[in-house]
Amino acid sequence: MGEGNIVTQVLLPLSLAFIMFALGLALVVADFKRVVTAPRAFLVGAFGQMAMFPVAGFVLASLWPMDPALKVGVMILASCPTGATSNLLTHFAKGDTALAISLTAVVSIASVFTLPFVVGASVVHFMDAGTRPDISVAQTMIGVFLVTNVPVALGMAVRRWAPETALGMERVARHVAAVLFVFIVLGAVYSVREDIRDYFAQVGLAMLTLNVAVMALAWLLGRASGLARPQRIAVIIECGLQNGTLAIFVALTLLGSTAMMVPGGIYSLVMFATAGLFLALVLKTRAGV
């Protein structure tokens, strides 16, 4: 197995699995019960992540001039759930952290079923028959399940049966997961360093546009739905931050495409810049948002 294969087939899946395990350590069954106890806020957030974001991604990919593989990469990103760091940012922004955790947990599990179909349809729609990578919806579903749902379930099991151990592990695991995320994103960008100028020219502004547009639409959605300010903050952050590590995993490990990985890598850089600006805004402006 070559060095590149070791990274994409071993290190990347294991890193993503650890990140999802760290997420599971913070979850309890009550996080899933909020789907019933606070349905309106949850449904608004879930709609924003699972419907609004993919539609916005499809519109942008259809209209923005870029290579077909990059268009598919946009759709891979758009069909991923939010990243675990969204919960921490929601907490810092004085948002509804419980809602953010519930959205992250449920949408992450649901994406196992939705992501493969969106990606499969996007490959067929945007790419010519001769350039399409081999993709199996079932195999993609299994691959995503093994590196997301299984580690989350293991983390929750530790939290359930050994809560003190889980709390101690969570503090360390959260920091390790953050470091792994940074290395994965920077490593993904570095791997295309020879073509990075061309890729940034094609999708850099597009990813910024997508990120700002989705956060603005999430704000409008929260306002129109009559959500309280903390809930609106949670929905905006949950919709704006995506699981870039999962997008990179699907593109590189499951589809074997470096180009399809680029939108997820660039978006991961952009989203923390805009999230930081949003955090500064909500902390400065106690009313509104």
What is each stretch, according to the model?
Residues 1-289:
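Alpha-helical transmembrane segments of multi-pass small-molecule/ion transporters
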